[in-house]
Amino acid sequence: MYTITKGPSKLVAQRRTGPTQQQVESRLGELLKCRQPVPPTALPAHLQPSAQTQGPWPLASSGPRLVFNRVNGRRPLTTSPSLEGTQETYTVAHEENVRFVSEAWQQVERQLDGGPADESGPRPVQYVESTPDPRLQNFVPIDLDEWWAQQFLAKITNCS
């Protein structure tokens, strides 16, 4: 049987996601003490420090790490950094398939529009219903984008 403690365990209480403020300040003090400017004449021109690179932290370290508390104990939703800025790549076979389907469809459209037909081969036939269904006599197609926009606006006006 499990027992439930009143407070957080030692592991949770001691767990830190970054350095303490005291550690950060002591490291900053060490870096500032050890850092003594070299006379500019001692270094060649390409090795002289610029105003942008000077600072209390070395270039390899970006400073103290920011710590964000979790909301309701849940991890924040993050997207993969590799997926954010990348563009989708297609294989050669995929591009060939797309090109084939596109060319075939354009050929069918030209033949339907009355373009030159090959006498040897059959022409495409567009389906037209000869006897329409009486239940669809009063059918009116809707624009789904417009319908969703109306639903969205209705939700907004009802909430406020």
Curated annotation (Swiss-Prot):
One of its GO terms (molecular function) is RNA binding. The modification Phosphoserine is found at residues 61, 82. It is found in: Cytoplasm, Stress granule; Nucleus. The modification Omega-N-methylarginine is found at residues 35, 65. Keywords: Acetylation, Cytoplasm, Methylation, Nucleus, Phosphoprotein. GO terms for cellular component: cytoplasm; cytoplasmic stress granule; cytosol; nucleus. The modification N-acetylmethionine is found at residue 1. One of its GO terms (biological process) is fatty acid metabolic process. Pfam families: FAM195. Residues 1-22, 43-64 are annotated as: Disordered. The keyword Amino-acid biosynthesis does not apply. Belongs to the MCRIP family. Interacts with DDX6. Interacts with MCRIP1. This is MAPK regulated corepressor interacting protein 2. The gene is Mcrip2.
